């Protein structure tokens, strides 16, 4: 996931970083270059150090050789990652390894092979070593991948306890009101960047539902920019370059982290003093304790609130945007979704309820099919800490072990008419239905996304509102290609045409 755009752009990250930091100053440029070179040497030594001897009789996964030192297959993979993986699957089977930027990646494709990753224990296939470098500067210390896995699992359990049906029933009306207010500015017709619009709306609705009214009330343009700067910390430069480099994007990220934390601290203190009952995640965190009875600190609460929002913001907005284009391309399907609104909710389309939302089965399948063809995250990774055996091969410690939802969800062996957008496929028997890990847009096992149910409530409510208000069309038949240069696979130039429905 985190390597993808980096690999496509090659050395451009370094060049841009130098230019931003040095302004062309020769000495500064040399210092940055030295730091970068030392980082590469470190990564190379790390990779060599991981080349451990396999147990006697063990067989390594098929290795895809590259004549290019260090970079390996970075350029080919970055240019067309899905094609690269699918071709490798056809040639080498479900398990294979290759090198990129000094690291060895072993992919597990197909449900049977992917089971190794999703069923693994953290001490065998470790997530912190892969994701901690990115998430800690954004979320803060003491939460998520900055803490021992046992503590992280407790934090996830606490958050999940707040993502319950009782709260969802309240969230539907909150999200619907936010959406109606947001779309007032769209007017009768026009053309919009639907990804940008939905990104803004997802932030507004998620903040209101999850953070509470105190924090939502402060979400103005300045705070929205702080979120954007903080979100900018999830970058290829953040993965590749040392965190202490004075890059503008790093400085903006760190400043935004401090300012947002301060906003949250004030809201937390105000809530602690309040006598009014509240039903949101903030209150859940304030009322919760760890197993040993210790309450969460204000800093932990603030970090978990940031993590909960940003972990789902891009994925939900990307999925929502892609679904808009699938519906705009298939107008009969879009009409059926609109008719479903009237059939389930009533001809006069009254305000939505959670119970009605559950009965919007076609819309539900449209989201599910969008997540199949356009899962926001192409690769889920773990660091092998112990030798792992799968399909007759042994993966040594030090390998980055990967599963690709994108590839698994379009394998010829598992999916009939695999590249077609067909929401009704889930009404029929298909090979994938008998495979546990053929469909994994939210992951599986111990690291399955805890926000899956909230994401469905959020996306279904927003798109129910959009379908009630507007018809959507492609502009001159344009359907976006996938932007593989970003960490989340967004649509390229996602501008869509809309027209208000006649009453």
From Swiss-Prot:
It catalyses: a 14alpha-methyl steroid + 3 reduced [NADPH--hemoprotein reductase] + 3 O2 = a Delta(14) steroid + formate + 3 oxidized [NADPH--hemoprotein reductase] + 4 H2O + 4 H(+); lanosterol + 3 reduced [NADPH--hemoprotein reductase] + 3 O2 = 4,4-dimethyl-5alpha-cholesta-8,14,24-trien-3beta-ol + formate + 3 oxidized [NADPH--hemoprotein reductase] + 4 H2O + 4 H(+); 24,25-dihydrolanosterol + 3 reduced [NADPH--hemoprotein reductase] + 3 O2 = 4,4-dimethyl-8,14-cholestadien-3beta-ol + formate + 3 oxidized [NADPH--hemoprotein reductase] + 4 H2O + 4 H(+); a 14alpha-methyl steroid + reduced [NADPH--hemoprotein reductase] + O2 = a 14alpha-hydroxymethyl steroid + oxidized [NADPH--hemoprotein reductase] + H2O + H(+). GO terms for biological process: cholesterol biosynthetic process via 24,25-dihydrolanosterol; negative regulation of amyloid-beta clearance; negative regulation of protein catabolic process; negative regulation of protein secretion; positive regulation of oocyte development; regulation of cholesterol biosynthetic process; response to human chorionic gonadotropin; response to insulin. Changing residue 316 to T/V/L: Significantly decreases lanosterol 14-alpha demethylase activity. Pathway: Steroid biosynthesis; zymosterol biosynthesis; zymosterol from lanosterol: step 1/6. Its EC number is 1.14.14.154. Keywords: Cholesterol biosynthesis, Cholesterol metabolism, Endoplasmic reticulum, Heme, Iron, Lipid biosynthesis, Lipid metabolism, Membrane, Metal-binding, Microsome, Monooxygenase, Oxidoreductase, Steroid biosynthesis, Steroid metabolism, Sterol biosynthesis, Sterol metabolism, Transmembrane, Transmembrane helix, Ubl conjugation. One of its GO terms (molecular function) is heme binding. Changing residue 314 to F/A/K/D: Significantly decreases lanosterol 14-alpha demethylase activity. Increases the susceptibility to ketoconazole. Changing residue 130 to A: Decreases lanosterol 14-alpha demethylase activity. Changing residue 139 to A: Impairs lanosterol 14-alpha demethylase activity. Changing residue 144 to I/V: Decreases lanosterol 14-alpha demethylase activity. Increases the susceptibility to ketoconazole. Its main location: endoplasmic reticulum. Its cofactor is heme. GO terms for cellular component: acrosomal vesicle; endoplasmic reticulum membrane. Ubiquitinated by MARCHF6, leading to proteasomal degradation. PROSITE patterns: CYTOCHROME_P450. Inhibited by azalanstat. Inhibited by azole antifungal agents ketoconazole, itraconazole and fluconazole. Belongs to the cytochrome P450 family. Sterol 14alpha-demethylase that plays a critical role in the cholesterol biosynthesis pathway, being cholesterol the major sterol component in mammalian membranes as well as a precursor for bile acid and steroid hormone synthesis. This is Lanosterol 14-alpha demethylase. The gene is Cyp51a1.
